[in-house]
Amino acid sequence: MRPFVHFFIPELIYLKRLIKDARKIIEPELEFRMAERPDVVKPQDSLSWLDDVRAGRPFDVVSGQLFLTVAAIHTTSVVITALMYDLVKNPEYIHLLREEAIKVYREDKEWNKTSLYKLKLLGSCMKESQRLNILGPIPTFHMRDPEIFGADSDQFDGHRFLRMRQRPGEENRWQFVSTSPEFLSFGHGLHACPGRFFASNEIKIAMIQLLLNYEWKVLDKPPQSRFASRFVPDPETLIAYKSRTPEIEF
């Protein structure tokens, strides 16, 4: 039935229209780049990377670009949303994270990779939120295994991974970007997410902006996932915000 029914499903019709719109934008750019112009430097972007990978073989670059967009933007935005949910439910961490960001910035006078690495409480909160709010469709019990994460493994503890990193020999094992058989949010081994280092810095920068420039609070019901098996933000959840004067200018 699917080869025939999919033509009439509203959601699929809408998706096909979006793909068609994407082709109108991307394909002319691909044709422009394929024209031989020795004086033009090849752009360093995802379209160029996809073109390098296909190496002349048949490959739908538009579909590849759309896949990368979903993989890079959707996952990052969901992780940020989940962390915001956890912080409004545990507001004591909002003040602590602001203090950490202010301290690091005043020491380094700028934001760079080293200063972002110093935001260890923020990294711990990010990993704790990722542990409790699983993005994959397959539930993983070991992410809440009390033998690994403690008797309170069902509760949000923003200091959990900060403490675990203080154990001898485990300083790097429990960073946000670290993978292991006990923590599979980014996969593990050869197939671990290659973009997790960029995503970590991206999330930290976004959270610094949100923490220092805004106050948040829940308007109605406590924020939660739409599904128990994996984290999907509830679109009916309302988080109110208002501007605040940041303690530092950046």
Indicate residue ranges for each PLM-predicted region.
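Central I-helix of cytochrome P450 enzymes
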Residues: 47-100, 129, 195, 203
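Cytochrome P450 catalytic core segment centered on helix I
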Residues: 1-55
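C-terminal helix/juxtamembrane-tail motif
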Residues: 215, 229-250
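Conserved cytochrome P450 K-helix/beta-meander segment immediately N-terminal to the heme-binding cysteine loop
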Residues: 144-173
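Active-site-adjacent bridging/hinge elements
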Residues: 1-2, 50-59, 171-184
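Conserved cytochrome P450 K-helix E-x-x-R motif and the immediately C-terminal K′/meander segment
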Residues: 108-148, 173-176, 180
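Active-site rim elements
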Residues: 113-116, 188-196
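Cytochrome P450 heme-binding "Cys pocket" and the immediately downstream C-terminal segment
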Residues: 178-179, 190, 196-234
